[in-house]
Amino acid sequence: MDITSVTVGLPVTDIEASCLWYGAVFERTEPDLEPEDGVAEYEVGGIWVQLYEDDSAEENPVSVRFGVDDVGAQHARIGSLGIDIGPVECVDGAVNWFDVRDPDGNVLSLFSLVDETGRGSGRDNGADRAL
């Protein structure tokens, strides 16, 4: 099997409200694609996140994990949006992560890998960027 693309579907009860929420989290002003009413898609990190309206979305939440260069910076940025987020958790020598729930209970888990010294991946510590 030669997989050419990955799309993760997330059920939401209100597509417009969810597009505002995901737009803020993904730093986008609008979805990349709206193929039909009640569906919006964002291309992030080489995959597509598809939001689709489903009246029973809150009954079956989905979890999606995203690797980022600096989980601490993303934690601060998303928290500054007024979005309720969990604390940054640490798995010694492996990963730092936190979870955030969308308005329908779907979980986005953001993580950064930790190098041998116990620090972030070293690819981008965000020290030269303002939030």
Regions of interest found by a model, annotated:
Residues M1-C19, G46, V62-V64, V114-L131:
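N-terminal beta-strand motif that seeds the catalytic metal site of vicinal oxygen chelate
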Residues D2-S5, G9-V49, D55:
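Core segments of cupin and vicinal oxygen chelate
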Residues T4-T13, E43, S56-L131, ...:
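Vicinal oxygen chelate
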Residues Y22-V25, I78-G82:
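Alpha-helix boundary/capping residues
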Residues F26-L33, R65-G67, P87-C90:
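Short linear motifs in intrinsically disordered
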Residues D54-S56, C90:
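Short polar/acidic secondary-structure junctions
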